[in-house]
Amino acid sequence: MAAPLLMIIKNQTDHRQDPNPNPTHLSSSIQEAKSIAKISLPLILTGLLLYSRSMISMLFLGRLNDLSALSGGSLALGFANITGYSLLSGLSIGMEPICVQAFGAKRFKLLGLALQRTTLLLLLCSLPISILWLNIKKILLFFGQDEEISNQAEIFILFSLPDLILQSFLHPIRIYLRSQSITLPLTYSAFFAVLLHIPINYLLVSSLGLGLKGVALGAIWTNVNLLGFLIIYIVFSGVYQKTWGGFSMDCFKGWRSLMKLAIPSCVSVCLEWWWYEIMILLCGLLLNPQATVASMGILIQTTALIYIFPSSLSISVSTRVGNELGANQPDKARIAARTGLSLSLGLGLLAMFFALMVRNCWARLFTDEEEIVKLTSMVLPIIGLCELGNCPQTTLCGVLRGSARPKLGANINLCCFYFVGMPVAVWLSFFSGFDFKGLWLGLFAAQGSCLISMLVVLARTDWEVEVHRAKELMTRSCDGDEDDGNTPFLLDSLDIEENLVF
């Protein structure tokens, strides 16, 4: 009887026991790399497709041959990104740790609840954003913008208002699918939506002559198509059956858990988005503002293109880490995090080589103005260095999201970008003679310090504690944050994100 008894005790105490006996670390890492690649490759294609959609819209905007319309549309897009899209994108990320950990824990109905809660949250947030957008002209005029450009910006953003509703559904649905490692349907849906985007814009802008209104309506129409394709997939594939318990009044509970994750996630996203907007404003104060602002626009588009790759990897790592924590597998979560970091280092090297290879020809894809070409060529190698830090730190942000520690990530971003990077950028650009180059050296300082901070966090993470926190998150999310008087409130424990060991 002793042997069976020992076996029972071992099975009950070793919660990390895996059905596959003692795989080597190398084989586990290789298998994990395959799992990450399976999720991230379709996401990269999806990102490239959606990037091309934005470029198509800008091309039709440029073909209007109306400088005030082009300026107004560009200004409206920047305003929409800062005051609307960044907020909705950031808030939606709050559901990611809940969904990935719930899927790993096989508590599938919680995914449907998180989807309902987050969609409702974004719809509610769209109301004050809409009020702000309705007053865009007054706001722009208050800050000294040209009246004609403000009029055009108002036209564009008023016709973009329905997009807030569409984004309130699109963001949660994407996360809902990604959390289950379902990414190919996202790619197919984006492909067909972008394929239709060209004739839609041609019809609205060129054939019907709607001009700036047509560009805005074309973007909305494409998002309607994208949302429709995703809903069709969810319904006909049956993927919703094990995760959807129908519309439930429980979606009005559990908001404290969601908000404690959503608000730091939103802050983290906005801090990065707003950094580039501040950089553009600083360009206007440099020695040659017209050339530097134009070059900054090209370089921001370039970094947005490169960012698709580490961002997709970050989402994949977040999914894998969260799934394993939810499945009570701390060792596998650790392997997922370290494997993702290794892949991101290789990705950073590739991004640096790309920036170096195209530095002398990239700007000519956008302009023939020699001063702009010269500035862009000068800064691209610095961007390559930035990507050495950006790719790993973006991936490690995914580790923090998957382990439900967005507050820690937001604090790191705040300190590194605004207390390190911004002062360095201002000092080098305006007081040390580096001018335009100094702004990007400031970004390099921010990315480098951010990477070091993230590496320290990863090295000190206690994965056993993270498994415990994952269980608590699942309990609170299911029970609607009701305090039973014995278990410490989830959000207090989530605030203690220093659950790290040396």
Swiss-Prot record:
Its main location: membrane. The chain crosses the membrane at residues 41-61, 75-95, 123-143, 153-173, 190-210, 216-236, 267-287, 293-313, 338-358, 372-392, 414-434, 439-459. It comes from the Eukaryota. GO terms for molecular function: antiporter activity; xenobiotic transmembrane transporter activity. The keyword Transmembrane helix applies. One of its GO terms (biological process) is xenobiotic detoxification by transmembrane export across the plasma membrane. The keyword Transmembrane applies. InterPro entries: MATE_euk, MATE_fam. It is a multi-pass membrane protein. GO terms for cellular component: membrane. Keywords: Membrane, Transmembrane, Transmembrane helix, Transport. It is found in: Membrane. PANTHER family: MULTIDRUG RESISTANCE PROTEIN. Belongs to the multi antimicrobial extrusion (MATE) (TC 2.A.66.1) family. This is Protein DETOXIFICATION 49. It comes from Arabidopsis thaliana (Mouse-ear cress). The gene is DTX49.
